[in-house]
Regions:
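Short acidic/histidine-centered micro-motifs embedded in hydrophobic/aromatic stretches
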Residues: 40, 187, 227-231
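Cytosolic-facing loops and C-terminal tails of multi-pass membrane proteins
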Residues: 2-4, 11, 80-105, 233-315
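Polar-ligand-bearing catalytic/cofactor-coordination segments
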Residues: 22-34, 83, 87, 95-182, ...
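Transmembrane alpha-helices and immediately adjacent membrane-cytoplasm interface residues
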Residues: 47-111
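Juxtamembrane extracytosolic/periplasmic "stalk" immediately C-terminal to the first targeting helix
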Residues: 29-33, 66-70, 110-114, 302-311
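Loop-to-helix transition at the N-terminal end of transmembrane alpha-helices
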Residues: 30-44
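Select subsegments of transmembrane alpha-helices in polytopic membrane proteins
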Residues: 40-50, 279-280
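N-terminal signal-anchor/start-transfer transmembrane helix
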Residues: 6-26
């Protein structure tokens, strides 16, 4: 039983080591690649965590499949039942957290669509009457395509060129389906606490991705930087910053985003940065795959141990 617990402990501790590596990797990559790396790492690490707990939870059931009496297994491994129950409790907590968070996403999305019922439509743009300066990408819902939602207060706060940047930014969110990446990372954070910081970092890189696409659309990085800054200053902070399907122009560290836009266009890493990026990619991928391999190895080890006990007649 000691080896089984060691395998599970290693699988559960891996995200604490892999998450910082994923965050460092994201800083070396352009926004698009950084967003994909963070999302993929979060999902893989969360999956490894769930797989390890499932493997630990069904140890007594494997004994039953091998036609071993549970009393004999408990006599051999006294901790098997309480440890399995603890794993089951952890899985139940994860299931509740995932359900509540997913339901929260759906409720927020439905509520946002409800608030646009009286909006003026112009193609993919919905203009909502209101003094508050608001702008966000509204994903599709129940067969309705995604829309860019902007308040009249936000439109009045920006000049024509700045409005073009704002609309290009929000359209980039819709076109890239960034809400799916954000939701995947948010749900992964509900599985393992070490992944919560990845979701926060992902918010920044998704906004940087949209910022760069907006700058390319207007072909003027300084205008894009000015527009992002003015829109963020005019708008109110999002109620649930980065924790749902609505991505807003004032999400994330705006000063850092503006400084990035005032600098050169992001490029793929070269030289030492490229070597560091490759090393970090390998480390994060290895950690995620190791978590899955540990979960599979746990299953195989339990089956082997059960067969050995049966063959030697110890249970």
């Amino acid at each position: 039983m000691g080896l089984i617990l060691a395998i599970v402990a290693l699988a559960l501790l891996l995200p604490w080591a892999a998450a910082p590596a994923a965050r460092r990797l994201a800083l070396l990559l352009p926004p698009r690649e950084a967003s994909l790396a963070l999302t993929g790492g979060a999902v893989l690490l969360a999956g490894g965590t769930v797989a390890a707990l499932v493997g630990l939870f069904h140890v007594p059931f494997l004994a039953g499949l091998e036609h071993l009496p549970l009393s004999g297994v408990v006599a051999r491994w006294p901790a098997v039942v309480p440890v399995s129950c603890a794993a089951g409790a952890a899985l139940a907590v994860q299931a509740v957290r995932l359900t509540l968070r997913w339901r929260g996403h759906r409720v927020l999305l439905a509520r946002a669509w409800g608030l646009t019922a009286d909006a003026t439509s112009d193609g993919d743009l919905l203009v909502v009457a209101g003094e508050e300066a608001e702008a966000f990408a509204l994903p599709g819902h129940r067969g309705r395509p995604g829309r860019v939602v902007v308040s009249t207060g936000m439109l009045r706060a920006l000049g024509p060129e700045e409005r073009a940047v704002l609309l290009a930014h929000e359209r980039a969110h819709l076109r890239g389906r960034h809400h799916l990446l954000s939701a995947a990372a948010d749900l992964s954070a509900a599985v393992h606490p070490a992944l919560a910081r990845l979701r926060v970092d992902l918010d920044y890189h998704l906004e940087r991705w949209a910022d760069e696409q907006a700058a390319a659309a207007v072909t003027d990085r300084r205008t894009a930087a000015t527009a992002i800054a003015r829109a963020a200053l005019a708008g109110s902070p999002p109620a649930r910053r980065g924790a749902g399907p609505l991505l807003s122009v004032n999400t994330g560290p705006v000063p850092q985003r503006v400084r990035a836009l005032l600098g050169p266009e992001p490029a793929r890493p070269t030289g030492r940065r490229a070597h560091a990026a490759v090393a970090l990619v390998a480390a994060v991928t290895l950690a995620a795959l190791l978590g899955a391999a540990l979960a599979y190895g746990l299953h195989e080890y339990v089956e082997y141990a059960a067969r050995a006990l049966r063959d030697h007649g110890t249970v």
